[in-house]
Amino acid sequence: MNAPGGRRKEGRRTHRPREQDRNVQLSKALSYALRHGALKLGLPMRADGFVPLQALLQLPQFHSFSIEDVQLVVNTNEKQRFTLQPGEPSTGLLIRANQGHSLQVPELELTPLETPQALPLTLVHGTFWKHWPSILLKGLSRQGRTHIHLASGLPGDPGVISGIRPNCEVAVFIDGPLALTDGIPFFCSANGVILTPGNAEGFLLPKYFKEALQLRPTRKPLSLAGDKETETQSGPKLSSRGGRRKIQQ
């Protein structure tokens, strides 16, 4: 519809996308502060990972957010990344990340999974093509975090809340009972993510891989064979600039 003078009149814009962007911004800021940056930011983190929410909101990057904003993100986060709980009168509300820490959190609420029967029937790690050759040769690494993250199913499976990204390209299925037999510990976080520190070097070795599955663009089994075959499993070929064919490594 044209407004007088020939200018086009736009319809009313909804504020919902802006609100969603704001919630994503807050969720990312919370994830960094509570998983990785608490010490750098001067936050008083307890041994169980909780920090006073009021102390968090006093940081410059949180000045535009309120307690209600945080409560909304905590309550609506699909992966249930955070927990809020009442604290002492002197501290008020407390908040923590349920998993994903690079910080040492010695008393994080984790349930030990000490027998094969305690483990989920499916243990799977999601990754991307660029990491697959290295994973197939060396195993899964916890890298800078305290644990390797596993899920009890693939993205979209019933009951799978967190532990695997929906855009993962490769799924690696783990033989949990075999790893337990070798002394590899497993835990379950408050939001259902299965966690393991791996071996002494922080790896879950390829000997514990049961199978692997390409998830994108279509699902199909992947070989767990050695070096030469690994080179052919670098994902779908993509056209690069100038018309050359390029394989993601």
Curated annotation (Swiss-Prot):
Positions of post-translational N-acetylmethionine modification: M1
**One GO term (biological process):** tRNA splicing, via endonucleolytic cleavage and ligation
Q: Which UniProt keywords apply?
A: Acetylation, NAD, Transferase, tRNA processing
Q: Name one Pfam family in it.
A: PTS_2-RNA
Chain segments carrying region Disordered: 1-25, 220-249
Q: Which InterPro entries match?
A: Ptrans_KptA/Tpt1 (IPR002745), RNA_2'-PTrans_C (IPR042081), RNA_2'-PTrans_N (IPR042080)
List the EC numbers from the record.
2.7.1.160
Q: Which reaction does it catalyse?
A: 2'-phospho-[ligated tRNA] + NAD(+) = mature tRNA + ADP-alpha-D-ribose 1'',2''-cyclic phosphate + nicotinamide
- What one GO molecular function would you report for this record? tRNA 2'-phosphotransferase activity
Q: Per the record's keyword annotation, is NAD included, yes or no?
A: yes
The Swiss-Prot or TrEMBL record describes its family as follows: Belongs to the KptA/TPT1 family.
Biological function: Catalyzes the last step of tRNA splicing, the transfer of the splice junction 2'-phosphate from ligated tRNA to NAD to produce ADP-ribose 1''-2'' cyclic phosphate.
Name of the protein in question: tRNA 2'-phosphotransferase 1
Species of provenance: Mus musculus (Mouse)
